[in-house]
UniProtKB/Swiss-Prot annotation:
Main function: May play a role in DNA repair. It seems to be involved in an RecBC-independent recombinational process of DNA repair. It may act with RecF and RecO.
GO biological process: DNA recombination; DNA repair
Gene: recR
One Pfam family in the UniProt entry: Toprim_4
CDD domains: TOPRIM_recR
Native organism taxonomy: Bacteria, Bacillati, Bacillota, Bacilli, Bacillales
Zn finger spans (C4-type): 57-72
Record's keyword annotation contains DNA repair: yes
Protein name per its UniProtKB record: Recombination protein RecR
Keywords: DNA damage, DNA recombination, DNA repair, Metal-binding, Zinc, Zinc-finger
Length: 198
């Protein structure tokens, strides 16, 4: 379908977002065209401000509008426990629990030989420097339970073994309320491995 150039550019811009295919991009473009001009300007301003005003924390790598971020600056946090996650959105997910009281380290990716991403391409060197400079007693590896996340966790655990720092991995398994029949083999296997005495 041929669209006027401004609509085509808008559709192309939406398609650059993850999970947005051609049909959704067209829907979003026409939705924006139907919005009030003030709302469109507010939306555009929010995008520009987020890109301009946010950066990565120099300590943990989490996204923030101040450096260091609010978590690294919180004196009530247990600085001796560092939870290593892949992305800033993982920090947000962990914080929703309101149970974890340690600090974080965001890798901003995972090792992926097929994708050409090695340890030096993610935030691992900064993690090692941080662990050398600070009095960390435990590192919790909370990378995703996929091939890349597992490879990253394994790589970090091997790097840290000689340091004497306790390295743990979050448990993986069945979601609460989930049925066994809908779980895949890997999930069931991880659930069995992570079983504990009751």
């Amino acid at each position: 379908m041929h669209y006027p150039e401004p609509i085509s550019k808008l559709i192309d811009s939406f398609m650059k977002l993850p999970g947005i295919g051609p049909k959704t991009a067209v829907r979003l473009a026409f939705f924006v065209l139907d919005m009030k001009e003030d709302d469109v300007l507010g939306f555009a301003k929010a995008l520009v401000n987020a890109k301009r005003d946010l950066a990565y924390c120099s300590v943990c790598g989490h996204i923030t509008d101040r450096d260091p971020c609010y978590i690294c600056n919180d004196s009530h946090r247990d600085q001796s426990v560092v939870c290593v996650v892949q992305e800033p959105k993982d920090v947000i997910a962990m914080e929703k629990m309101k149970e974890y009281q340690g600090v974080y380290h965001v890798l901003r990716g995972a090792i992926s030989p097929m994708g050409g991403i090695g340890p030096e391409d993610i935030n691992i060197p900064q993690l090692l420097k941080r662990l050398h400079d600070e009095t960390v007693q435990e590192v919790i590896l909370a990378t995703n339970p996929n091939i890349e996340g597992e490879a990253t966790a394994m790589y970090i655990s091997r790097l840290l073994k000689p340091t004497g720092i306790k390295v743990t991995r979050i448990a993986h398994g069945l979601p609460v309320g989930g049925d066994l029949e809908y779980a895949d083999e890997v999930t069931l296997s991880k659930a069995l491995e992570g079983r504990r005495e009751v």
